[in-house]
A protein has these predicted regions:
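N-terminal beta1-alpha1 cap of cysteine-dependent amidohydrolase-like domains
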Residues: 1-93, 100, 114-147, 153-155, ...
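Post-Walker A helix-loop "phosphate-sensing" segment adjacent to the P-loop in P-loop NTPases
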Residues: 102-110
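Active-site-proximal beta-strand elements of phosphoester/diester hydrolases
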Residues: 187-191
Length: 217
């Protein structure tokens, strides 16, 4: 964010708590260019890439958090994690980045699509908003359930890009979870499990599986 002309970085404490409660140690990763250029999302210098490589080489797992937009730094972090088989958990915007970036295809797809369905998917403060149908995939392996109920606070969604697996749908047909094959652990969820771990065991299991995969990497 830009506040009074200065770049400010924020991280919801729920992400921090979810990682710590499962035995992980959080480490924030961002590029110096992002600070210097005041949110110029199209710039990533060689020096910044070198700094990112140095930091990311020390990471056992990558949590792509929610937010309002993404930049070249986010794309580079995800690309690094995919190429180096580092466990990934993408949440809300983090899942949308995973689902909109095909690093192995030169044709870049459209990013996201604004929601226009029967369910209001942006409901802050609600513990539960809608059901999700879980398909065979990584999410099912973690939860061993065919459906769950989740919170929801997103205005955009992704479409099927063929290079990822669809792990869950909402009742109105939006993609709610994805995974990437041939990767140690790469799961994206459209809802916010970090906000639910204190009252929903399934959300705790998602973070537990992510941290365990990270410890083993």
């Amino acid at each position: 964010f830009i506040i009074d002309g200065e770049s400010v970085f924020q991280l919801n404490t729920e992400y921090y708590s979810a990682i710590v409660k499962n035995g992980g140690i959080p480490l924030g990763v961002f590029s110096s260019d992002y600070c210097i250029q005041n949110n110029n999302s199209n710039f990533l210098s060689d020096e910044s890439i070198s700094d990112l490589d140095n930091i990311l080489s020390k990471c056992n797992g990558i949590l792509m958090t929610g937010g309002y937009n993404w930049n070249k730094c986010d794309e580079y972090i995800l690309e690094y994690a995919l190429k180096n088989d580092i466990p990934i958990l993408g949440i809300c915007l983090g899942m949308q980045i995973m689902g909109s970036m095909d690093f192995f295809n030169s044709d870049m797809p459209d990013r996201t699509i604004r929601n226009d369905t029967i369910i209001n998917h942006f409901q802050k403060g609600k513990q539960y908003v809608h059901k999700c149908k879980i398909l065979d995939g990584l999410l099912y392996k973690i939860l061993k359930k065919n459906s769950i109920v989740v919170n929801s606070r997103h205005n955009y969604h992704i479409e099927d890009r063929k290079y990822f697996n669809i792990d869950a749908y909402s009742e109105d047909g939006l993609i709610e979870a994805i995974s990437i094959e041939n990767h140690k652990f790469a799961l994206g969820v459209q809802w916010h499990p970090e906000s639910m771990i204190d009252y929903d065991e399934d959300m705790f299991k998602i973070f537990k599986a992510f941290i365990e995969a990270s410890i083993q990497s």
